[in-house]
C-alpha cells in the first residue's frame, strides 16, 4: 500500500489518528482477528494475545502483528487501547493491568463501530446464516468493482482471509448478537436473516428481551437507512410492524419483496428465480447448496439491488461464490480401499452449524444434493447450556442421518450439566428407535470408529462449533485411514 492510499484510508477515521498501538486480548478469534487485520493494513501498530496459535494468528503474524501466546500484564505495555473479546473474563491479567494503567478497554464491537462510523456500513445479523450472507454481499460488491472492506466471522474462501481492507466507501460486517454487542453498530443497511432462541444467558432467558434487542439494533439505522429481513421467519414477520425503518423483505413467501421461486438443487449448486419489485426477474445459479443458502443469496441480492448494482455482476458473483470456511466445506473425496478394504469412496464435508436449525439445514442440503449417499454424521455438541436448552430439538434433528457418531460436548468454558451430556443425548436418540448412535469418548478414536460404518457410497458430515474443525482437517490429511501405532509415532 503506497503512502497516498494509506493517507486516504487514515482520513476515513480521523479521530483514531491519536491512537498508535492497539492490543487485542483473544486475537485468535475469527471476529477479533478480522478487525485486527483491517487495522494492521490501515497502518496501526497491532499486538495481541491468545493461548495457542491457529490459522488466524498465523495470518496476522504474516502481516507483522506481534502476538503473545500467553496472558501477561506486560503484554499491554505502551498500548493506546485494549480490545477485548466476549470470551475474556474481567480478571484476565491484561485487562486488570490495562485498567490499572488507565488504558481504555473496549469490546470488539466498539472498535468495529469506529471502523464503520465513517464508511457506508452494511451489517448482517441473525441467529443463522450471518457468515455466509456477509461473504455473499462482499463477493457481489467486489465483483461490481466497489472494493469493499469486509469483516467476517468465518474465512471468505475467495479472498483467503476473514477480513480485507478495501479502498471503497463500503464496510460489510457480520454483526454478533451473542453478547448483544451489535448494539454498538450504526450501519446504513442491516440484514436480519432470522431470530431464534440462542445465547439466552445474555438475554436473561427471556425471548422477548432478545426480540427487543434486535429491534433496538435496527433502530440504530438512520431514518433513511434500510432493514432487509427474511419474512419466512415467523419471529421477523411478527416484529416487522415494530421496525420503524424502511424495510425490504425476502423469502420464499408470496408476499416477499424479493421472492425465491422454482428452487432446485443439483449437487452443490442451487438454481432458482428471484422476483423483485419494479425489476426484471433473474435466474440465479448459486454455487452453494441448500434452500437456506438461497435465502442468504436473496438477502444479498436485495441489498445489492437497492444499491443499484447491475444484475450481471450479481449473477457472476453468486455463480462463482466459493463459500466460507466450515460452511458445507468440501474437504475431499477419498477411496475406501485403504480405509476399510471396501470399494467406492466417501465424501468429507466440514460444517460449523451447531444449533438444531443449522444442523437440519445442512442435512437437508446433503440429502437434496446427494440423495443416494449413505449420510454419516460426526457431531460435537457445543456448550452444555445449549445442549440442555435445545435437547429435544437436537434429538429430533440428529435422527435424520443414516449413521451418527457423537463426540463429548465441547464445553466452551462451561461446567457440565447433568443430563445435558453426549451420553444422555445418545441414549435419548437410541430410544426413539430410528438409529443407534455411537459415542466417541476420545477424539483420537474418530478415524478408527468411523471406518467400519462407511459403505463405499458415503457423505460424511463433520458438524459442530468446537474443536471439531481440527478433527475434520485431520481426517482429510490422513484420507480417513485409521493410523497404526507406528504411523502415529512417526507423526
From Swiss-Prot:
The keyword Ligase applies. Its EC number is 6.3.2.8. One of its GO terms (molecular function) is ATP binding. Pathway: Cell wall biogenesis; peptidoglycan biosynthesis. One of its GO terms (cellular component) is cytoplasm. It catalyses: UDP-N-acetyl-alpha-D-muramate + L-alanine + ATP = UDP-N-acetyl-alpha-D-muramoyl-L-alanine + ADP + phosphate + H(+). InterPro entries: Mur-like_cat_sf, Mur_ligase_C, Mur_ligase_C_dom_sf, Mur_ligase_cen, Mur_ligase_N, MurCDEF_pg_biosynth, UDP-N-AcMur_Ala_ligase_MurC. The keyword Cell division applies. It is an enzyme of class 6 (ligase). It is found in: Cytoplasm. One of its GO terms (biological process) is cell division. It comes from the Bacteria. Keywords: ATP-binding, Cell cycle, Cell division, Cell shape, Cell wall biogenesis/degradation, Cytoplasm, Ligase, Nucleotide-binding, Peptidoglycan synthesis. ATP binds at residues 126-132. Belongs to the MurCDEF family. Cell wall formation. This is UDP-N-acetylmuramate--L-alanine ligase.
Amino acid at each position: 500500500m503506497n503512502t497516498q492510499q494509506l493517507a486516504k484510508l487514515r482520513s476515513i477515521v480521523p479521530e483514531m489518528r491519536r491512537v498508535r498501538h492497539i492490543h487485542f486480548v483473544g486475537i485468535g478469534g475469527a471476529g477479533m482477528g478480522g478487525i485486527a487485520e483491517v487495522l494492521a493494513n490501515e497502518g496501526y501498530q497491532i499486538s495481541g494475545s491468545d493461548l495457542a496459535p491457529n490459522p488466524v494468528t498465523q495470518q496476522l503474524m504474516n502481516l507483522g502483528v506481534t502476538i503473545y501466546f500467553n496472558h501477561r500484564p506486560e503484554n499491554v505495555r505502551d498500548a493506546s487501547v485494549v480490545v477485548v473479546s466476549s470470551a475474556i473474563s474481567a480478571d484476565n491479567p491484561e485487562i486488570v493491568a490495562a485498567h490499572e494503567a488507565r488504558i481504555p478497554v473496549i469490546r470488539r464491537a466498539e472498535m468495529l463501530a469506529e471502523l464503520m462510523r465513517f464508511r457506508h456500513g452494511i451489517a448482517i445479523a441473525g441467529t443463522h446464516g450471518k457468515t455466509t450472507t456477509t461473504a455473499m454481499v462482499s463477493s457481489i460488491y467486489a465483483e461490481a468493482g466497489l472494493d469493499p472492506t469486509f469483516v467476517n466471522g468465518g474465512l471468505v474462501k475467495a479472498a483467503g482471509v476473514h477480513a480485507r481492507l478495501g479502498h471503497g466507501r463500503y464496510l460489510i460486517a457480520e454483526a454478533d448478537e451473542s453478547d448483544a454487542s451489535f448494539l454498538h453498530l450504526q450501519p446504513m443497511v442491516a440484514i436480519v436473516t432470522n431470530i431464534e432462541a440462542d445465547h439466552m444467558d445474555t438475554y436473561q432467558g427471556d425471548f422477548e428481551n432478545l426480540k427487543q434487542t434486535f429491534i433496538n439494533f435496527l433502530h440504530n439505522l438512520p431514518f433513511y437507512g434500510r432493514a432487509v429481513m427474511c419474512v419466512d421467519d415467523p419471529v421477523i414477520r411478527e416484529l416487522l410492524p415494530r421496525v420503524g425503518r424502511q424495510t425490504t423483505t425476502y423469502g420464499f413467501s408470496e408476499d416477499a419483496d424479493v421472492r425465491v421461486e422454482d428452487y432446485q438443487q443439483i449437487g452443490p449448486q442451487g438454481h432458482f428465480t428471484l422476483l423483485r419489485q419494479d425489476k426484471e426477474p433473474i435466474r440465479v445459479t448459486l454455487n452453494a447448496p441448500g434452500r437456506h443458502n438461497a435465502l442468504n443469496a436473496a438477502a444479498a441480492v436485495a441489498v445489492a439491488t437497492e444499491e443499484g448494482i447491475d444484475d450481471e455482476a450479481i449473477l457472476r458473483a453468486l455463480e462463482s461464490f466459493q463459500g466460507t470456511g466450515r460452511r458445507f466445506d468440501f474437504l475431499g473425496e477419498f477411496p475406501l480401499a485403504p480405509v476399510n478394504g471396501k470399494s467406492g469412496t466417501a465424501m468429507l464435508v466440514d460444517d460449523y452449524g451447531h444449533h438444531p436449525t443449522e444442523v437440519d439445514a445442512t442435512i437437508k442440503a446433503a440429502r437434496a444434493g446427494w440423495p443416494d449417499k449413505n449420510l454419516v454424521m460426526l457431531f460435537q455438541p457445543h456448550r452444555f447450556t445449549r445442549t440442555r436448552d435445545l435437547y429435544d430439538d437436537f434429538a429430533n434433528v440428529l435422527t435424520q442421518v443414516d449413521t451418527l457418531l457423537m463426540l463429548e460436548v465441547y464445553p466452551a468454558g462451561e461446567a457440565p450439566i447433568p443430563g445435558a451430556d453426549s451420553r444422555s443425548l445418545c441414549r435419548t436418540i437410541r430410544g426413539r428407535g430410528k438409529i443407534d448412535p455411537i459415542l466417541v469418548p476420545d477424539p483420537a478414536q474418530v478415524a478408527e470408529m468411523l471406518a467400519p460404518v462407511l459403505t463405499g457410497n458415503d457423505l460424511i458430515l463433520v458438524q459442530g462449533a468446537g474443536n471439531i474443525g481440527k478433527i475434520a482437517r485431520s481426517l482429510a490429511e490422513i484420507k480417513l485411514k485409521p493410523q497404526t501405532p507406528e504411523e502415529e509415532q512417526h507423526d
